[in-house]
């Protein structure tokens, strides 16, 4: 009947509106996460390109993303060498670092508590960017031990480590 067709058209229009809105919603949500991972609290137009450039640099130089995000905290605290050390060519990150540092400084300078803002950025970064993630080889080792030998000890240690992803236990990085 025409009522059914009208309902279907209306439902399709509603779903289409939601689907059409999704890319913008997703991009905005992703940018909010990236700002946090970069240690930024305010919104600036260049933030998406800053995050994209960092990710492209990591990919181009085959740098471990998790470690790089984590070592931004060291850079925020004034020592970019741990981040640079992840790159085969340690100076490759320098142009991006200058942009990120300028962006952080602009945010800090706008804050009447700028000294506090600088001091807490590294802490925020360490609370946002995990050090421990479920790396494939670690999960496979735990699964192999459990399935081949019924040994859950490695699984239990991995699970315990993953329950504290922001700790600095280098055994699980």
Feature-to-residue mapping (PLM):
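Regulatory N- and C-terminal appendages and interdomain linkers associated
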Residues: 2-173
